[in-house]
Design a protein with these regions (language model features):
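Ankyrin-repeat boundary/linker signal
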Residues: 11-12, 53-56, 100, 139, ...
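Residue-level signature of the C-terminal ends
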Residues: 26, 38, 42, 82, ...
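Ankyrin-repeat inter-repeat connecting loop/turn
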Residues: 9, 52-53, 97, 134-136, ...
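Conserved ankyrin/ankyrin-like repeat signature
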Residues: 4, 30-34, 74-78, 114-117, ...
Length: 214
């Protein structure tokens, strides 16, 4: 039965973490590729296929979250190539890419290549603003922007990579200002932190980004 197949393919360990999730955590690209190909070749309903590819742990965190958090760019790209097989709807792909806190962690940790890889996967989706807004409007539960954390930690190249993703889409002026302001929970913009820290490189990069978006 499909339920039996689902249980076997999920390969959940003693810690309630699916095997695919562990592969994302550890950056095992070849395993992700092999597993994804098996999932697409196995006769499953779309919701069961979605369940397996999300590979969520016991805290409901998907495998892609851990790849972003840990900076496994090649794993993210491999996942993107699997999603690009045209066997999933845009809505299903969007569900698999809803890893806001993962992108937040990638910005905070300065995982530039991982963010670039995620941006490449987004190109699979139609460029509807509601899709992109939902995936890139990144704040933690207390309201601090992921981009603010990149400023806070001086991750200049990471800021550039994320803003290059924004350039691929047409945002309203108001939304773009909100995103680029990169505020924390108190409304303090990220560039303010760069000024306080005398982070000249990040300030200059931010000025270039603002100029490009005018």
């Amino acid at each position: 039965s499909q339920e039996t197949i689902l249980t076997l393919l999920a390969a959940v360990g003693a810690n309630n973490v699916p095997g695919l999730c562990m592969s994302f955590m550890n950056g095992h690209v070849d395993t992700i590729k092999a597993y994804g190909e098996i999932v697409f070749k196995t006769p499953l309903t779309s919701d069961k296929r979605l369940y397996l590819l999300a590979a969520k742990d016991s805290h409901d965190l998907p495998g892609l979250f851990f790849a972003l958090q840990n900076g496994h760019a090649d794993s993210i790209r491999m996942f993107g190539s699997l999603l690009n097989k045209k066997m999933l709807s845009s809505e299903q792909i969007k569900e698999l890419l809803k890893v806001k806190h993962g992108l937040f962690m990638a910005l905070q940790n300065g995982h530039t290549k991982a963010i670039m890889a995620y941006g490449d996967i987004l190109k699979i989706l139609p460029p509807h603003q509601e899709y992109i807004d939902e995936l890139l409007w990144i704040k933690n539960p207390n309201g601090t922007s992921g981009l603010f954390m990149a400023f806070y930690n001086g991750h200049t190249e990471t800021i550039r990579a994320f803003c290059n993703i924004l350039k691929n889409y047409s945002f309203t002026t108001r939304r773009l200002v909100e995103m680029l302001s990169a505020t924390n929970k108190d409304g303090i913009p990220g560039v303010f932190v760069s000024v306080v820290n005398r982070d000249k490189e990040t300030i200059l990069e931010y000025c270039r980004i603002i100029k490009e978006n005018n």
